[in-house]
Amino acid sequence: PNSLPNRYCQVVDVKMYRNTFVDCTNIEFGTGKDMERTLAPEKVSFTDNIIINKGLDQPYIAVDDVAGIQFKDNKVQLAKNYSAPGFTTEKVKAPQLPDDAAIRKDKGASWFKNQVAHPAANVHKEYNVSPGTNLSEVIHSAEPGGVIILAKGTYPIQRAMFIDKPLTIRAADAANKPLVRFNGDKPDNMVTIADGGKMVIENITFDGVLEPGKALAKAGISTAFDMIQPYTLIVDGCEFQNFGEGGFFAIKGTKATFAESVTIRNCLFRDLSGDAINYAAEKDDIGRYNADDMLIENCSFYRLLGLPINIYRGGSDESTAGPYITIRHCTFVDCCNKERGSVMRLIGPQVLTVENCNFDNSGRGGATIRLDEATWEKVRIANCNLWN
């Protein structure tokens, strides 16, 4: 009621009839009610429909008042007999659904050509690298799907390792992590993921300590600006240390980039002035965000001035469903105790789980977990310990 221009109006004068729903688990009426959208649907009819689902006890979910919806002559076949005004249980012959795939070349607009090239991954190609080798050149020449194996030692890099294809970078020996250190003349990332990039990185140490006469690394792992394609990132068993500039982060997603999934597990973040994990670059508050599905588990955060985890999805636009955030089995020690700081800043995740985490002397100047959730968001925080 009294909606602002271009906002929501009440649902009225809608007819839904002669539809067949087979194994549909979410038939809902009144979805989306909040303090702005207060009027339930009116003059709506749901007539002569068929609902078949052996896994449900009732045909629909009433999220709000359904008095304005007329149910009539609907047939249902559910897990058990169901009787309600407008619904009868009958044995209904399910429609025969096609089980063959559509022929793609015969579908879609005739003028459309898919211009996105997806390089075939060569999962068998390995590249053994020793200290003194130019990592950027090895990555540039590696085939898609290649595995770059680093021997123990220090690898100074002068510019970002540019990942624009599926690649894996791992240590030859997990117990002796290779150390990557930036010594370029201009600030740059250590690793930059670009269009086409899908990266797995395992058991590598990223050291952001300042080399005399050289520039600082802007990030351990980050993204190119204004990417068109989504990417995936898996970071396992890595260490990020000695990033001494407040605006430079260990792992970061930049504005206008989007990760389908980010997995960070078994990692150590220590002695950082900036954030450890930052996916908070979309500040326009129009429903955009940097990563859709994020898993952070079994990680340790020690002596951080910045935020250990900073994820942001602003605005009230419901056309996007994410992000989905899971944080579990993580430890935070002496992290972000500055005034109004927070250990986790989690703004706008649609589904959030934080469980089995320990917070020791962290977030004392502000909040341990800072949320700004909407009524429809699913938030679970369980089995966490806090000591100060």
Sequence positions of predicted segments:
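Acidic Gly/Asp/Thr-rich repetitive segments characteristic of extracellular carbohydrate-active
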Residues: A117-I157, F162
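Surface beta-loop-beta hairpin patches that serve as ligand-binding interfaces in beta-rich domains
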Residues: Q77-E126
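Extracellular beta-strand solenoid repeats
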Residues: K15, S45, I149, P156, ...
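Right-handed parallel beta-helix/beta-spiral solenoid domain characteristic of secreted/periplasmic
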Residues: P131, K165-T223, G237, N242-G244
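Short glycine/acidic-rich loop motifs that flank beta-strands on beta-rich extracellular proteins
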Residues: P1-N2, C24-T31, G55-A62, A79-G86, ...
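Acidic glycine-/aspartate-rich tracts in secreted/extracellular proteins
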Residues: G153-T154, D173-N176, N388
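Right-handed parallel beta-helix
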Residues: P1, V12-D23, E42-N53, G68-L78, ...
